[in-house]
């Protein structure tokens, strides 16, 4: 034991460390309690089992990093407070993340365009089947008049390869007949089927822009405007110089695959008949390095592996927000309810939408606010867990124009220098979010206020237990 108290410096140091550590430990403990409360509630409420041929309800999760930060910042919020609740509820999910601006918008727009193509093919197939059925009915009538049997023979029409099933040979369906696999979303009410979670204000902006681009934009990419100067420059290259070199002529005849590369390297131009245009430029003016030989390495285009390393391709918007009013809703999406032909569930943009803000401050002047938030993460945990419970229970309402400002307070944390530079280069995130009423009326948004807070209930029950009236 100490014979005397430590010095005032050590006492101050011990007090600061104890208070700081106690605050962190208390906040971590409260976070774990809140997470356990929601996880246990969801596990008990979603304890019903599904049939073996039914796939569970599936959510689409879009994750974008905060400005001037890494993607792991948003993924931490997802892994800590959203994923455990979805895992305990038994719901399936698909994550789409983007590290660059435009990746999520490009992915969402391509999915909407793919859905439109599938709907068009489905409608064409239905028309073709109806036409063939009509023509077949007349053919059967003529056969019936002649006394020919019109009943098809299933044994003769069905091929042995089509009727063979390995599972039947193994005896899997000996006691139970095979059943078609369906999704739970196709069996539920359209207002509670599926769901979309946008983690971050940036992901929400790209989701709205991507849906509008896919619905109001064209199916194919608009043609790019090519400047005429580029073609004139290539036509004026000194291509006739190579005509005096017999090696080039030999390559152009025997190796057509290398001719294009060699011609692009030295700047040769070919006419429609395959002959090389001639000029008065002497052959001695070309350096020896430009003449393609067997020892000269030929430049090739980057392979697919290098493209995969660069990341997904980000395409420019097929339609700008200023052109939304002039565009029309396509005929395949004009129905009140759009059903995905593959899953039988409503289209993902008609499913309930939840937006989760990712507060993230940076900079030296924001250190006091960052410290205060660090010791109060339990409140953010409660907010995110409560919102996740709302989408699990599918508590939603129709989308309104004011919902375009969901999680708009997150933009207050964005660095001002980043916002200013984004405005200069035309960044998508710093632009005001615009929407078309014809598209927005297809959306549904999750309303957490409909679901009572479990943490609030827990606090009220504890107060009632500690009140003097209950003692």
Swiss-Prot record:
Region (Disordered): 272-317
One Pfam family in the UniProt entry: Tim54
Record's bilayer topology term: Single-pass membrane protein
Keyword Transmembrane helix: yes
Mitochondrial intermembrane topology ranges: 26-471
Disulfide bonds listed in the record: none
Mitochondrial matrix side, ranges: 1-8
PANTHER family for this protein: MITOCHONDRIAL IMPORT INNER MEMBRANE TRANSLOCASE SUBUNIT TIM54, SPHINGOSINE KINASE
Protein's name in the database: Mitochondrial import inner membrane translocase subunit TIM54
Name of encoding gene: TIM54
């Amino acid at each position: 034991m100490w014979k005397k108290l430590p010095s005032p410096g050590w006492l101050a140091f011990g007090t600061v460390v104890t208070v700081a550590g106690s605050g962190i430990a208390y906040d971590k403990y409260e976070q774990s309690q809140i997470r356990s409360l929601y996880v246990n509630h969801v596990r008990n409420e979603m304890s019903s089992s599904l049939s073996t041929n039914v796939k569970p309800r599936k959510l689409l999760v879009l994750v974008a990093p905060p400005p001037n930060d890494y993607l792991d910042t948003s993924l931490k919020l997802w892994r800590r407070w959203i994923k455990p609740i979805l895992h305990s509820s038994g719901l399936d999910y698909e994550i789409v993340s983007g590290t660059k601006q435009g990746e999520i918008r490009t992915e969402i727009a391509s999915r909407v365009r793919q859905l439109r193509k599938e709907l068009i093919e489905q409608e064409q197939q239905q028309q073709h089947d109806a036409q063939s059925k009509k023509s077949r009915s007349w053919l059967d009538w003529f056969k019936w008049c002649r006394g020919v049997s019109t009943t098809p023979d299933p044994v003769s029409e069905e091929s042995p390869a089509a009727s063979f099933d390995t599972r039947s040979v193994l005896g899997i369906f000996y006691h139970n007949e095979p059943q078609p696999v369906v999704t739970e979303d196709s069996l539920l009410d359209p207002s509670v089927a599926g769901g979309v979670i946008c983690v971050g204000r940036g992901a929400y902006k790209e989701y709205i822009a991507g849906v509008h681009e896919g619905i109001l934009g064209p199916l194919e990419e608009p043609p790019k405007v090519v400047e005429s100067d580029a073609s004139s420059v290539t036509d004026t290259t000194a291509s006739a110089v190579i005509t005096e070199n017999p090696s080039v002529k030999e390559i152009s005849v025997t190796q057509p695959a290398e001719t294009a590369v060699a011609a692009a390297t030295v700047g040769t131009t070919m006419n429609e008949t395959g002959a090389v245009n001639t000029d008065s430029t002497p052959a001695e003016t070309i350096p020896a390095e430009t003449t393609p030989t067997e020892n000269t390495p030929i430049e090739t285009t980057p392979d697919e592996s290098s493209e995969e390393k660069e990341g997904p391709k980000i395409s420019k918007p097929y339609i700008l927000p200023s052109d939304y009013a002039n565009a029309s809703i396509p005929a395949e999406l004009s129905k009140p309810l759009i059903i995905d032909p593959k899953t039988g569930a409503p289209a993902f943009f008609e499913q309930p939408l939840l937006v989760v803000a990712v507060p993230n401050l940076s900079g030296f002047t924001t250190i006091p606010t960052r410290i205060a938030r660090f010791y109060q993460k339990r409140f953010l945990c409660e907010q995110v867990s409560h919102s996740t419970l709302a989408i699990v229970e599918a508590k939603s309402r129709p989308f309104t124009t004011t919902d375009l400002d969901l999680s708009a307070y997150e933009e207050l944390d964005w660095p001002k220098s980043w916002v200013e530079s984004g405005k200069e280069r035309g960044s998508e995130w710093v632009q005001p979010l615009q929407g078309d009423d014809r598209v927005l009326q297809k959306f549904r948004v999750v309303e957490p206020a409909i679901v009572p807070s479990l943490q609030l209930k827990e606090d009220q029950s504890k107060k009632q237990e500690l009140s003097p009236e209950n003692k």
